[in-house]
Design a protein with these regions (language model features):
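Beta-strand/loop substructures that line and gate deep hydrophobic ligand-binding cavities in soluble
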Residues: 94-145
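Hydrophobic/aromatic beta-strand elements that line small-molecule binding cavities or substrate pockets
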Residues: 14, 72-77, 103-112
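Hydrophobic ligand-binding cavity/cleft-lining segments
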Residues: 1-47
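Structured surface interface patches that mediate subunit assembly and partner/cofactor docking
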Residues: 6, 41-44, 125-130, 143-149, ...
Length: 159
């Protein structure tokens, strides 16, 4: 896995030995296996599932034990098997952000290197939209427990 952090964006990539269609499907349809359950905004309530609604206008949300739903991202672009883009509706204080103009974006692109090998490129951008404290978002998602952990778990989910 390679990574780069700049003031405006966090970029990471990983290569997996599967066709691009499979790589895309695992990332979007098995995201609940990729996202650690302890990464949640439900407070003390445990997350029982994380769901990606695989369409533009859909959400990524966590469902808690009581059925409570926390929608923490909006699906902005969904172009199987090439890419998808989501909003990051989480503020610098790690609370839900309700103002779309103060949300950053995460783009995940899937590039076929061969018929059985895919490079997955993740870019978390427009972090400055979060306003004061945006650097804490950048540092948090770039931390080994942020997007690098998600990509590691993604590789494990690929098998």
């Amino acid at each position: 896995m390679t990574s780069a952090t700049q003031s405006e964006a966090v970029r990471l990539d990983v290569t997996v030995d599967v066709p691009v269609e499979h790589a895309f499907r695992v990332f979007t349809e098995q995201f609940g296996e990729i996202k650690p359950r302890e990464h949640n905004l439900l407070g003390a309530e445990e997350v029982v599932e994380t769901v990606v609604e695989t369409r533009v206008g859909g959400h990524i949300y966590d469902r808690g034990e009581s059925g409570t739903v926390c929608r923490w991202a909006r699906v902005l672009v969904f172009e199987p098997p090439r890419r998808f883009v989501i909003s990051w509706d989480i503020s610098p204080t790690w609370q839900l952000e309700t103002d779309p103009s103060r949300a950053s974006e995460v783009e995940v692109s899937f590039v076929a290197e061969t018929s059985d090998r895919t490079r997955v490129e993740l870019e978390h951008r427009h972090l400055e939209r979060h306003g004061e404290g945006w650097e804490s978002v950048r540092d948090g998602v770039a931390d080994p427990g942020g997007w690098p952990l998600y990509l590691q778990r993604y590789v494990e989910a690929i098998g």
